[in-house]
Structure formats: C-alpha cells, structure tokens
C-alpha cells in the first residue's frame, strides 16, 4: 500500500470531479475452484485498490458525496480464517491505513443503498465484470443482470485520474518492468528442445521473485505441449 494520504487525496479529487451523489465501489470475493474454501488466487478489483488500497476479499465501499461519508463495509475474520492465516489486524485497523475511519458490517451496505435510493440520491457504479457484482446490484438496487447502466461521469473520473501517474506509482511500474524482464530472461534460459511448456511456466513463476497476479502468457493455456523446434 501507499501512504494513507495518497488514498485520501485520490478520493478527494474524485469527489470534486463527480460533485454529488453516492459512489459505489464493488470489491471482489473469493472464488472457489471445487469447493468454497479451496479458492483461486485472489485478485482485488483494481479500482477498489486504487482508491482504498485494501487487497482483501469480501469488501465493498461507498463514498457518499452529499453526506460527506466514506465507509468500508466488511466483516471481521472468523476463527476458521485465523487458523490458516494467523492473527490479523482488525478491519478497522486495515481501513485506517487507507484513511477510512468508518467501517460497518457488510450486511449494512444494502440498507444504506436502499435508503439512498428511496431519497432519490444518484448512485454511481462502474461496469461489472463478475457475476457476483451483478447479483449484488440486483440484491441491493433491484438492477436486473444485463440491464446495468454504469455511470459515465464515474467512469471518466476514474480514467482521468488513473491516466496520470505519481512518482510513487512510476516507481512501482518500474519494479514491475524489472520483474517482467527477469521472467523473459528466465524463459529464454529455460526453453530447449524436449522440455514441457509447464516447466517454462514454473521457471517464470519462481524466477520472478514475486507471486504473479496473472498466469504466465505462454502459447498454450494448458502448458502441456512439448517444445519441438523442428516443427514450424
């Protein structure tokens, strides 16, 4: 995470750009591979990360411009999670690191949004890309999946902010470029006739020194092909 002042400044600029209404930020949830607790590697929504910085599942947030409120909605970890993860900071402590002082249980976001809807307050949201997001919009706001109308001002506000990079963002981009170069060099050193593509992918993952957010982009999705330079 960056400093809390960075996230506070980003949110303040967005509020100034949009001007009024309520901004809804849908965080991502865990996604099970073959049962609920055996999950794929988690990736937080990029917009949620940009404005709130918290890379944890099961969170959503609102910026209520009209009432000058910034709230993160989420639940504390249960003992089942703590067994696997060890002692963790509370959600309130995590949120304070992003400059958010108000945290509420996740179930309360539905009531908050419905109250705003009944008052005629504009509710801005971004395009959905997961079924879970569509289900939440239907549950909270009665928006039928496929009938979403994302807020154009919200989209433009986010895009215009993210187009311009701060020095600390550029530093992180440069680190990512170094990792990418290391992965390419590792692949070049590893590949040879008779090796499986999965071995090349494994070398890239280990050689990058960081856990990848996305799979290695090699020619075949399954990585089960043999390298044979005699074939075209």
Which residues make up each language-model segment?
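Short catalytic-site patches enriched in acidic/histidine residues
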Residues: 33-42, 139-142, 152-157, 164, ...
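Gly/Pro-rich turn-and-neighbor structural signature
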Residues: 18, 29, 187-188, 210
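Secondary-structure boundary elements
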Residues: 115-118, 179-182, 192-193, 210-214
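A composition/biophysics-driven feature that prefers long, compositionally simple stretches
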Residues: 1-181
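Residue-level signal for secondary-structure boundary elements
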Residues: 121, 146-148, 185, 192, ...
């Amino acid at each position: 995470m960056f400093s809390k002042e960075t996230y506070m400044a980003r949110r303040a600029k967005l509020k100034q750009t949009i001007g009024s209404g309520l901004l809804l930020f849908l965080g991502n949830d865990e996604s099970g591979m073959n049962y609920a607790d055996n999950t794929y590697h988690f990736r937080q929504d990029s917009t949620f990360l940009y404005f709130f910085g918290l890379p944890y599942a099961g969170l959503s947030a609102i910026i209520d411009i009209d009432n000058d409120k910034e709230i993160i909605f989420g639940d504390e970890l249960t003992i089942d999670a703590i067994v696997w993860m060890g002692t963790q900071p509370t959600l309130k402590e995590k949120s304070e690191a992003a400059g958010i002082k108000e945290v509420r249980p996740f179930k309360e976001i539905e009531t908050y949004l419905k109250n705003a809807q009944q008052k005629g307050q504009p509710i801005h949201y971004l395009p959905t890309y997961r079924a879970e997001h569509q289900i939440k919009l239907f549950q909270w706001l009665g928006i039928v999946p496929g009938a979403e109308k994302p807020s154009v001002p919200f989209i433009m506000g986010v895009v215009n902010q993210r187009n311009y990079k701060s020095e600390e963002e550029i530093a992180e981009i440069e680190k990512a470029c170094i990792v990418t170069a290391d992965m390419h060099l590792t692949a070049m050193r590893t590949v040879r006739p008779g090796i499986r593509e999965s071995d090349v992918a494994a070398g890239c993952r280990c050689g990058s020194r960081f856990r990848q957010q996305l799979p290695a982009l090699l020619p075949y999705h399954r990585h089960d092909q043999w390298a044979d330079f005699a074939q075209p």
